[in-house]
Amino acid sequence: YHYLELRFGSKGLRVLGAVMFIIYQVGRMSIIMYLPCMVLSSLTGINVNLLIVIMGIIAIIYSYTGGLKSVLWTDFIQGSVLLIGVTFSLFFLLAHIDGGIGTIFHAFATEHKFLAVDQPIFNPNILKDSVFIMIVGAGFNTMGSYVSSQDIVQRFTTTTDTKKLNKMMLTNGGLSIFIATVFYLIGTGLYVFYQQNALPPAAAQDQIFASYIAFELPVGFTGLLLAAIYAAAQSTLSTGLNSVAASWTLDIQARLSKKELSFEKQTKIGQYVSLIVGIFAIVVSMVLANGGVKSAYEWFNGFMGLVLGILIGTFILGAFTKVANTFGATLAFIAASAVMVGIKYFVPAEDVTIWSYSIISIAVSLVVGIPASMIWRKVKGDTSEPAKYTTIYTSK
């Protein structure tokens, strides 16, 4: 969030951005703990709260002691195992479906597994569900995580030049498209498979794939893949804890401190933050586990659009306009936050689709931020230009 300070000359905006990111990460880490632990609990009979505590403690320990380097390597190893495992699961699933992949594509076409019956391609009302709004909303959510989420951005800083960064981004994009395709095919494949076979009694809405892994895959591979899912969740947790610690130390503590913090002091603060935030995320995850979440996928995407949408709106305001200033950006941030809280908690869920959250946040940021900045400049006689490299107009 150093960018916000550079672009708008405001420590306050940098701190606000960091606080919003930390809120997002706590919610994200909580859902990441909740999902695999609910699945393993239903399959093993172990209390879900105990599994959440164990997962959280392990993630806290190696985030606390290992730092970013350990996080990156565990991410790579566990991610590789998970990628290979789910790809194998897809091929194994296809081999045991009567008709193979052709049956899956038939389900796409005839059983509304590609588009729901009541889901139009386009709806002029952007507050309602449509394929267009899902694509645009998901696109802005993804853009928000790549532009304004410290856990993603900190990976960029590990590269040594833009050539390697571009290569990393292209590889990431290709793998993301591949793994998303694999999971969507698995989802429809499971629907077809359980039309042809009995559904295990333990399988709930968010647990069908895990039930398939446990009851249908070869025994040795079942244990490996379930362990990989659990480990990958721990790895993602440690990434979140590490990024929260870095953001708190550099974007909040260092900005608010009257004297410069030594490297040793920053490290110690980061470790304490990892511990405190980790414990808090464990508590929130236990609340989710006992709160009857209907669809974790929809809950998380709604939460992501709610929080990251506000952040990405501020980043877009800064990067794509020259007129935006501290006053306008701060007012836009506050207005977008107020509007989104109002929509989330005071508007019926069926009136506004979760995929519109980020679109609304960005629109409010621009509609409020640009006029407010122009009025402020006119009143104050401010003719200052943005710092070099902070907008698309000053990047050369």
Task: Provide a role label for each language-model segment.
Residues 1-396:
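Membrane-embedded helix-loop-helix hairpins and adjacent transmembrane boundary segments
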